């Protein structure tokens, strides 16, 4: 069976072992005579899948007992509305939300939050085209803010937080859609973590929300019941029918990660993959990456050919070498290699080898 190296930013590569196991179990999950896709979400079989998936995620991330794991729908885009609808009610209205703006996805969160609260952009890297993370001592926070929001990895700009910010007693909320499970973090430093699944966890359609217990029960009256975290938690993520098959694939991915050695092992490999690609980019003038080393993303590596007229040739010839989905986002152009957990280091080496050959041919 032919497989290519898929550098898509999302939906992204899924571990080959996971795809093979899902294929083997497609028509008959563990001898029950059913595909997971046709199981009742309240049946014994899926209840087992759901419980195991949540337990494995809790184990992988060392999630404390006073946090709920919610398996929802709508992606991080929906959570941009769901988060404020669940949290601004903790403060007298109109509440204020503090944001750190590091790029495209931060801006999406800011724009949506304005519908529900006052927004204070406490820090921004727009002055340098979103190529860095503002130092914590430059943030101008609101003392009584409902929460502080950060996007820990910007997929388009290739910028990633390399620290967990101290925001005092104000709840810290993080969109970790593109770097969840890629590096070790202390979950207890965050009040809420949310992530679309389609980058490091599984197929599109599932959203992970990790929420501290004291953040529950504050939903605004306008919040739809299906988006009220307290109700979702009370119904064990089954207030409405959950995305059963994406949950199943997420569970297989978590089991795969445990076999690899957990998040610590993933982080070690991710550091090696990123170093391999960035070291080459820094060694040549043929390609360029504009992000300072301290803020470079381990997950998404944007780069540009100095001669942009070669872009189409680069993508075409990369595809001929089984290296796909390397086109940069339309807002910035160039190229982008997304090297999430499922991308083996062999894929990054193949990309670097191709880039060297392409430079030799056209440089």
From Swiss-Prot:
Family matches, as Gene3D superfamilies: Aspartate Aminotransferase, domain 1, Type I PLP-dependent aspartate aminotransferase-like (Major domain)
GO molecular function: O-phospho-L-serine:2-oxoglutarate aminotransferase activity; pyridoxal phosphate binding
Catalytic activity, as annotated: O-phospho-L-serine + 2-oxoglutarate = 3-phosphooxypyruvate + L-glutamate; 4-(phosphooxy)-L-threonine + 2-oxoglutarate = (R)-3-hydroxy-2-oxo-4-phosphooxybutanoate + L-glutamate
Enzyme class, broadest EC rank: transferase
Pathway membership: Amino-acid biosynthesis; L-serine biosynthesis; L-serine from 3-phospho-D-glycerate: step 2/3; Cofactor biosynthesis; pyridoxine 5'-phosphate biosynthesis; pyridoxine 5'-phosphate from D-erythrose 4-phosphate: step 3/5
Span of the signal peptide: none
Keyword Cytoplasm set for record: yes
Binding locations of L-glutamate: 42
GO biological process: L-serine biosynthetic process; pyridoxine biosynthetic process
Modified residues (N6-(pyridoxal phosphate)lysine): 199
Domain of life of the source: Bacteria
Intracellular or extracellular location(s): Cytoplasm
Record: residues binding pyridoxal 5'-phosphate: 105, 155, 175, 198, 240-241
UniProt cofactor(s): pyridoxal 5'-phosphate
Assembly: Homodimer.
Cited function: Catalyzes the reversible conversion of 3-phosphohydroxypyruvate to phosphoserine and of 3-hydroxy-2-oxo-4-phosphonooxybutanoate to phosphohydroxythreonine.
Family in the record: Belongs to the class-V pyridoxal-phosphate-dependent aminotransferase family. SerC subfamily.
Protein name per the record: Phosphoserine aminotransferase
């Amino acid at each position: 069976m032919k497989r290519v190296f898929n550098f898509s930013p999302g939906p992204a590569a899924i571990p080959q072992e996971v795809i093979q196991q899902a294929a083997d179990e497609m028509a008959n999950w563990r001898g029950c005579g059913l595909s997971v896709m046709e199981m009742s979400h309240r049946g014994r079989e899926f209840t087992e899948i759901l419980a195991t998936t949540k337990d494995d995620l809790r184990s992988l991330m060392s999630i404390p007992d006073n946090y709920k794991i919610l398996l929802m729908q709508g992606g991080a885009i929906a959570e941009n509305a769901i988060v404020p609808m669940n949290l601004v009610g903790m403060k007298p209205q109109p509440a204020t939300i503090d944001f750190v703006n590091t790029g495209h996805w931060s801006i999406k969160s800011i724009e949506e939050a304005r519908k529900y609260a006052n927004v204070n952009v406490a820090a921004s890297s727009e002055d340098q085209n979103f190529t860095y993370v503002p130092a914590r001592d430059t943030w101008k926070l609101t003392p009584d803010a409902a929460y502080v929001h950060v996007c820990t990895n910007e997929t388009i700009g290739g910028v990633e937080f390399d620290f967990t910010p101290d925001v005092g007693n104000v709840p810290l909320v993080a969109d970790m859609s593109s770097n969840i499970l890629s590096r070790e973090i202390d979950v207890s430093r965050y009040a809420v973590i949310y992530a679309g699944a389609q980058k490091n966890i599984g197929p599109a359609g599932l959203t992970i929300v990790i929420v501290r217990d004291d953040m529950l029960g504050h939903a605004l009256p306008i919040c739809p019941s299906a988006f009220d975290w307290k109700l979702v938690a009370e119904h064990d993520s089954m207030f409405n029918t959950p995305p059963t098959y994406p949950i199943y694939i997420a569970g297989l991915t978590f089991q795969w990660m445990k076999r690899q050695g957990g998040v610590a092992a993933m982080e070690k490999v991710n550091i090696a993959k990123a170093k391999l690609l960035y070291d080459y980019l820094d060694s040549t003038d043929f390609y360029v990456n504009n992000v300072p080393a301290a803020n470079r993303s381990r997950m998404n590596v944007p780069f540009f050919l100095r001669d942009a007229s070669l872009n189409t040739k680069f993508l075409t010839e990369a595809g001929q070498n089984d290296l796909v989905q390397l086109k940069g986002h339309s807002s910035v152009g160039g190229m982008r290699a997304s090297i999430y957990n499922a991308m083996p280091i062999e894929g990054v080496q193949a990309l670097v080898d191709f880039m060297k050959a392409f430079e030799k041919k056209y440089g």
